[in-house]
Swiss-Prot record:
UniProt cofactor(s): Mg(2+)
Transmembrane regions listed in the UniProt entry: none
UniProt KW keywords: Acetylation, Cytoplasm, Cytoskeleton, GTP-binding, Hydrolase, Magnesium, Metal-binding, Microtubule, Nucleotide-binding
Modifications made to the protein after synthesis: Undergoes a tyrosination/detyrosination cycle, the cyclic removal and re-addition of a C-terminal tyrosine residue by the enzymes tubulin tyrosine carboxypeptidase (TTCP) and tubulin tyrosine ligase (TTL), respectively.
Annotated protein name in UniProt: Tubulin alpha chain
Length: 451
């Protein structure tokens, strides 16, 4: 089996985890108690969904997941909520005091008290796996636990599970809707620390999701529940190929192989289509060609940046539902003829396709319409550098005045870590710039100085 363990860190990670597991249960017909009436072979290990659920002797399905937060309120909602019977109590780990939006508290002071317990739980989950494929880690960049504890966890997972893939789903701080003043600090510190430990990180920008909810789903004031349900659809599309049998299945390592040309350039842009409310879906034609071209609209992206200003290095199209390869090929051929979509000259083919026959499921009472087919596009584009540049600029404004730095130093960090992290991100921006240069431009630049 190719099992995946999901780790949900901090408030954002835990709440997205809630939405994801609710959706997985609906997709697989698993009840909130963990029973699965449709599963005839009790204890059968060969079902595809066993990558995400382990099965007990009594036929109960338990998510292969750990929820961690340094303060209890958010995880308590799971302990008392509809799905409280689904999880083993030991999978829900909470501390007593939170990280207070402070990376240093999450990574050093408070985080290190809990890390061994968390790793112990992860160890127990991995012992139940026959062929652990890797970890999916959900967290935000802006919070103290999401940034600090995640980076500590990633470092330790690299030590304990060396070669196993680690994929992140990271909530990028929204440019307008900030929940903390120090988000730029936390984001840059966590990115610097996890950069070498993460194999692939899918960024989700809260503001982009707000705009999609307002524009496509006509929700005037989107709540976190609305955002998380949308994010869970995207996560479900990315993981569908691991949980169902499909025509063209894609596993975790395959994502990396096809999306990450250089180890540091591992931040694919996620786009999902169709995002549409029930009343609109009734009147629109959503064939493969339409949903495919919708993926190249910046408005449907999960991070605010403009790929028309950058170049694509690789593109992964994950279709689900009623889709045949012939339609996909036609749709992609059309896309390739458009001038606005540019690939780097060293990567001419650029498209990887996955098809899964399981149509998208929607949460009853949710905002999304039930559709016959959907596509999730993961593209590695140089335009993502815009998002880093925005964050770096905010970091610089605060750091020039050393604002708020004493809170971090007081928790045992050194000021040098700030400048080190900032330099690393400057290098990351430069990496993106160089990757986007055409081959001959790059050679001209290098050719000037003889060594």
């Amino acid at each position: 089996m190719r099992e995946c363990i999901s780790i949900h860190v901090g408030q954002a990670g835990v709440q997205i985890g809630n939405a994801c597991w609710e959706l997985y249960c609906l997709e697989h017909g698993i009840q909130p108690s963990g029973q699965m009436p449709s599963d005839k072979a009790v204890g059968g290990k060969d079902d595809s969904f066993n990558t995400f659920f382990s099965e007990t002797g009594s036929g109960k399905h338990v998510p292969r997941a750990v929820f961690v937060d340094l303060e209890p309120t958010v995880v308590d909602e799971i302990r008392t909520g509809l799905y409280r019977q689904l999880f083993h109590p030991e999978q829900l780990i909470t501390g007593k005091e939170d990280a207070a939006n402070n990376y240093a508290r999450g990574h050093y002071t408070i985080g290190k008290e809990h890390i061994d317990l968390v790793l112990d739980r992860v160890r127990k989950l991995s012992d139940q796996c026959t062929g652990l494929q890797g970890f999916l880690i959900f967290h935000s960049f802006g919070g103290g636990t999401g940034s600090g504890f995640t980076s500590l966890l990633m470092e330790r997972l690299s030590v304990d599970y060396g070669k196993k893939s680690k994929l992140e789903f990271s909530i990028y701080p929204a440019p307008q809707v900030a929940t903390a003043v120090v988000e730029p600090y936390n984001s840059i510190l966590t990115t610097h620390t996890t950069l070498e430990h993460s194999d692939c990180a899918f960024m989700v920008d809260n503001e982009a999701i707000y705009d999609i909810c307002k524009r496509n789903l006509d929700i005037e004031r989107p709540s976190y529940t609305n955002l998380n349900r949308l994010i869970s659809q995207v996560v479900s599309s990315i993981t569908a190929s691991l949980r169902f049998d499909g025509a063209l299945n894609v596993d975790l390592t395959e994502f990396q192989t096809n999306l990450v040309p250089y180890p540091r350039i591992h931040f694919p842009l996620v786009t999902y289509a169709p995002i549409i409310s029930a009343e609109k879906a009734y009147h629109e034609q959503l064939a493969v060609a339409e949903v495919t071209s919708a993926c190249f609209e910046p408005a449907n992206q999960m991070v605010k940046c403009d790929p028309r200003h950058g170049k694509y290095m690789a593109c992964c199209m994950l279709y689900r539902g009623d889709v045949v390869p012939k339609d996909v090929n036609a749709a992609i051929a059309t896309i390739k003829t458009k001038r606005s979509i540019q690939f780097v000259d060293w990567c001419p083919t650029g498209f990887k396709v996955g098809i899964n026959y399981q149509p998208p499921t929607v949460v009853p009472g949710g905002d999304l319409a039930k559709v016959q087919r959907a596509v999730c596009m993961l593209s590695n584009t140089t335009a993502v550098a815009e998002a880093w540049a925005r964050l770096d600029h905010k970091f610089d404004l605060m750091y020039a005045k050393r604002a708020f730095v004493h809170w971090y130093v007081g928790e045992g960090m050194e000021e040098g870590e700030f400048s080190e992290a900032r330099e690393d991100l400057a290098a990351l921006e430069k990496d993106y710039e160089e990757v986007g240069l055409d081959t001959f431009e790059a050679e001209e630049e290098e050719g000037g100085d003889e060594y």
